Amino acid sequence: MHTGEQYHEFMLGSPRDRAVRARFQQLALGLLPAGAAVLDFGAGTGIDAKAYAAHGHPTFVFEPAEAMRDCLVRHCRDEITRAAVVTVASPLACRVQAVTANFAVFNHFADHVALFEQLSPVVQHGGFVLASLLNPYCLADARYRWWRADLLNLVRRGHYAIPSESRIHRFAPRIVARAAAPHFRLERLAPRGLGLAYELYMFLLLRRV
């Protein structure tokens, strides 16, 4: 277990995670119209939220973990004071152009059908969900017994769960896209093809229809 502060310092100090975050933020900010509101779903300690607010986007943050939320309130104190960042107890408390979920937030949910159903009234038509999920095809994980044991499940079902305290679920992109319909349509996947063998995270852009 870790505290919010420990997680915050680790994420800021990890070159790999900083690079992943930079790519995710660049993609999100490039997709958002000027001044558009965004919900940071599973906002963690508010690192992304602070960046969105700095670029002029009213940012709502939903974070169920108390330790993370406490750190977020400290990290985004100035933004919260001027209402550039607003904490919400439920995603349904806002209506936005985009929902972002960075660093495997969606991997904590077994039922993506229910998740996208919940998010559908939050995102305006034409808006989007941008999610960073753990890549089930990453060959760097092949050294782990659980990856090899679940490879057949991935091929057959497109989904498996890792036995652990956090019960992380891994999904093939097609399974996420199927769960998102009919509310969202998969518009972009990065990386694609052979690139999926080398990246720990995959970015899915799902458009509200």
What is the predicted function of each stretch?
Residues 164-184:
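Short alpha-helix
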Residues 98-112:
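A short SAM/SAH-binding and catalytic strip from SAM-dependent methyltransferases
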Residues 91-99:
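A short acidic, Gly/Pro-enriched loop at the edge of an enzyme's catalytic core
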Residues 1-32, 35-44, 51, 130-155, 199:
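Conserved class I S-adenosyl-L-methionine
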Residues 113-125:
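A short glycine-rich, Lys/Arg-flanked "PGG" loop and its adjoining helix->strand segment in the class I
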